[in-house]
Amino acid sequence: LRVVAGDAMRRESLGPAVGGHDAVLCILGAKPEGADARRGQPGVPICSAGTKHLIAAMTAAGVRRLVVVSSASVGESRGTGRFPAPWVLRTLLREVMDDKEIQEAAVRGSGLDWTIVRPVKMTNGPRTGRVQVGPALRWGLGSRVSRADAAAVMLGTLSDANSIGAALTVTGA
């Protein structure tokens, strides 16, 4: 594993970052506030725009394997959430969820060997190894998973050919 810096909003910075690698893990995310200082560009759909830039850079560099973090309540996982979880997320985080939908569509249409990982609410807790992973897991407002466990799932998909072309919800066990 080698961590390489790049700016997802500057397409030209991504070529050198992805070239020569076997796979790319995309963990873009944004807070829903319009003035998110870390994002630096209020209103910019960083997940979808950044992922499209990343896909273009990967295609140009010949890198085939992509693992992307999305979110529970995106795509078909919206239908596996226990009420009122999907409704709450889609209402309170509409801009973020819409951006994630566009991001996932770009990944699915990329022609790359992709996996989408959809964690529930992430915490800063330690890695426990106690997770559930699957395309149709039930989840709710109380569902949690640590960032460390979600990262371990992402890394695990790299050696799992069955995860290619799959969108997987991740929850703590």
Residue spans for each PLM region:
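Conserved catalytic-site region of short-chain dehydrogenase/reductase
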Residues: 33, 72-78, 122-125
